[in-house]
Each structure stands twice: as C-alpha cells, then as structure tokens.
Amino acid sequence: MITQIRVDDRLVHGQVAVVWTKELNAPLLVVANDEAAKNEITQMTLKMAVPNGMKLLIRSVEDSIKLFNDPRATDKRIFVIVNSVKDACAIAKEVPDLEAVNVANVGRFDKSDPASKVKVTPSLLLNPEEMAAAKELVSLPELDVFNQVLPSNTKVHLSQLVN
C-alpha cells in the first residue's frame, strides 16, 4: 500500500529520508523517476541518502506503476517519491486506491524558464505543464492532494492553491 506520493524535485534528502519515512512508518522508499532509473551515478547518490535499515527501489515511472499494481505490494508500506507533478499525476491515474499526494517541493531546481513559473508557495514554482498536471491531479476523485513540506507544517489542499 502506498502511504503517500511526495513530489519533491530533490528526490531523496534529509527531510524525506529521515523525517517523512518515520512519520509515515514506511520502510520501503520507491523513487519513481525515468532519469534516475537510467543513471547509475544518480542511483548511487540516492542510495547514500537513505538511512540504514530502509529499502530503496529506483524505477522508471512505468515500472513503478507495474510494481504498485502488483498484488504482492498491497501488504507493504511504500513511500513514493517523484520529482514532478506530471509523474505523480501519471501514477495517480493508473494506481487504484491511492489516497494521498503531497506536492511539496517543485520548480526550484528544474531547468525551465523562471519567468514562465507561477509561485504557488515558496516551495512550489509551477511552469505551465506542471500547473496543468496539478489541476488534473486535484480533479481526480477521492484523492487527497496537498502541500506540506514537513509534518509539522499545516497541510494545505492543493485545490485551494491552483484553482
């Protein structure tokens, strides 16, 4: 079972590896990212950021969807990290019973034109493609889509920010 999908353009870092995995009680972290799945240096870097005792899988978005829909995954607590709203939306549309997507940190490190981005919050800078994906994501039924950088922060529903 997926405990949460977190959209964070930094993928695995201290907030994710230590704070959120503990908060969500998720011993399995899946990075669903096409580029990371193909890049051995990125994979080594991500593995170094994960605490001992935690399992990390790095898969393409397509392979991640297959993994999440495998019946053997239903009894596991899985925390999923993607680096774009577009990827979170692709997973949310294909994986039934997904409950929560945390659009936490987006747009500060991508290579898109800063002038094209809308500053939704200090941690969310969405280009037109990501904004369209965010609007599609919040329109999906029975899915809690929110922005919460840290567990101690107030959860803000994304529909209040992008509509």
UniProtKB/Swiss-Prot annotation:
EC number assigned by the record: 2.7.1.-
Single GO MF annotation: protein-N(PI)-phosphohistidine-sugar phosphotransferase activity
Domain PTS EIIB type-4 positions: 1-163
Protein name: Probable phosphotransferase enzyme IIB component M6_Spy0801
Positions of the catalytic residues: H13
Species of the source: Streptococcus pyogenes serotype M6 (strain ATCC BAA-946 / MGAS10394)
Chain's role: The phosphoenolpyruvate-dependent sugar phosphotransferase system (sugar PTS), a major carbohydrate active -transport system, catalyzes the phosphorylation of incoming sugar substrates concomitantly with their translocation across the cell membrane.
Keywords: Cytoplasm, Kinase, Phosphotransferase system, Sugar transport, Transferase, Transport
Record GO biological process: phosphoenolpyruvate-dependent sugar phosphotransferase system
Entry annotated with the keyword Transport: yes
Primary subcellular site in the record, as a coarse category: cytoplasm
InterPro entries referenced in this protein's UniProt entry, alphabetically: PTS_IIB_sorbose-sp, PTS_IIB_sorbose-sp_sf
Alphabetized Pfam families for the sequence: PTSIIB_sorb
GO cellular component terms, A-Z: cytoplasm
